[in-house]
A protein has these predicted regions:
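Small/aliphatic-rich secondary-structure junction motif
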Residues: 2-54
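Structural beta-alpha unit
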Residues: 1-2, 78-111
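A short acidic, glycine-rich active-site loop
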Residues: 58-70
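Glycine-rich, Arg-bearing micro-motifs that act as flexible, cationic patches
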Residues: 111-133
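General small-molecule cofactor/ligand-binding pocket signal
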Residues: 39-41, 87-91, 139
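Short, flexible loop segments at boundaries between secondary-structure elements
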Residues: 131, 136-142
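Short secondary-structure boundary segments
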Residues: 42, 115-116, 142
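Solvent-exposed polar/charged
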Residues: 31, 104, 132-133
Length: 142
């Protein structure tokens, strides 16, 4: 059985139940390895160049990223034991591209993510694209 010591947990902060399930899975998989590094990532998708985006304040993206970072830190504080090594990553861009780029850059052993939003059948388009284009193993949860 392969041991995973560097896990990337991709979460959607607007669906916390799925995020909690992904975290519990990663913690269970590394239960006997407290030195394993768990990287939790949340991706803020870009606003399309549209009429709506032209109405937003100049630093709107920075404010959104700062809020996402705060929410991710709050989430990890509530859902990870204090003694676990957790790295927080908030990225801005196309979800599947950012997840795959981060997985490569951080040389993770495994990506954990949810299949789709709660109550939806099948796989989300981002999950499919992460699986299709990633060079890393992926654990997709329902």
């Amino acid at each position: 059985m392969q041991l995973f010591n560097k896990i990337l947990i991709a979460v959607d902060l607007s669906h916390l139940e799925g995020a909690k399930k992904a975290v519990k899975t990663a913690l269970a998989m590394t239960e006997d390895r407290p030195d394993a590094v768990l990287r939790i990532v949340s991706i803020v998708p870009p606003l399309e160049n549209s009429f709506v985006s032209s109405l937003l304040p100049r630093n709107f993206d920075k404010d959104v990223l700062a809020e996402a970072n705060k929410r991710l830190h709050d989430f990890t504080q509530e859902n990870f034991p204090a003694d676990r090594k957790v790295q927080h990553i908030v990225a801005h861009g196309t979800v599947y591209e950012e997840i795959n780029t981060i997985a490569q850059e951080k040389e993770v052993d495994l990506i954990i993510m949810m299949a789709t939003k709660p109550g939806k059948p099948g796989l989300s388009s981002n999950t499919v694209k992460v699986a299709r284009f990633s060079e890393k193993p992926i654990l997709i949860l329902r």
